[in-house]
A protein has these predicted regions:
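Acidic/His- and Gly-rich active-site-bordering loop/insert found
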Residues: 1-99, 103, 107-128, 133
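Histidine/acidic-residue-rich, glycine-tolerant segments that coordinate divalent metal ions
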Residues: 87-97, 104, 116, 121-176
Length: 176
């Protein structure tokens, strides 16, 4: 069973990741910095992944034994809102902020990824990590560009599903 004492070692990096992401908010389907940050962390943790849906990421952590596939999803984008606070890690991007907690969702999923990667496969099945862009949509201009690239103009979820995010998944949990 996972208890607080078994995961406390993850907290400093979780906070660091959260603050970095909070400072670098990006709107739907524009999450280039966020996506690169996630990819860098997954590389550090030795977790294979693939980039999909313009800025989305699908990563799988395989267990040593056959079993079900459980997906965990975190949304990545920020909102077009000016942050008005004096946090030391406030948004550095004028007119954009993580007002919905997506920065925390990504930080938490990265911590879960690190934890599961550290188990060295000592579990059944597979854990699929879904880092989804544009959960609350994107600008009409951006959606048109995504559609022209072969993605879905309906947003991040439809684009991720079209890229196979839920293929073989038996259960899915999401942060929001």
């Amino acid at each position: 069973m996972v208890t607080m004492d078994k995961i406390q070692w993850l907290f400093p990096e979780l906070e660091e990741n959260y603050q970095y992401l909070h400072q670098h908010p990006e709107l739907g389907f524009e999450e280039q910095i966020t996506s690169a940050f996630i990819a860098q962390k997954l590389d550090e943790y030795g977790i294979p992944y693939r980039r999909v849906a313009r800025t989305g990421i699908i990563a799988d952590i395989a267990g040593k034994y056959p079993g079900r596939t459980v997906a965990i999803r975190a949304d990545m984008h920020a909102l077009p809102i000016q942050e008005q606070c004096d946090l030391s890690y406030a948004s550095k991007c004028p007119g954009k902020m993580h007002a919905c907690g997506h920065d925390a969702h990504v930080a938490m999923l990265l911590s879960a990824a690190r934890y599961f990667a550290g188990l060295c496969g000592q579990f059944r099945g597979k854990i699929r990590l879904l880092f989804q862009p544009a959960e609350e949509g994107a600008s009409m201009e951006t959606l048109a560009a995504v559609a022209a690239e072969g993605g879905s103009a309906k947003g991040g979820a439809a684009s991720m599903i079209a890229c196979g995010a839920l293929e073989g998944v038996n259960a899915c949990f999401a942060l929001h």
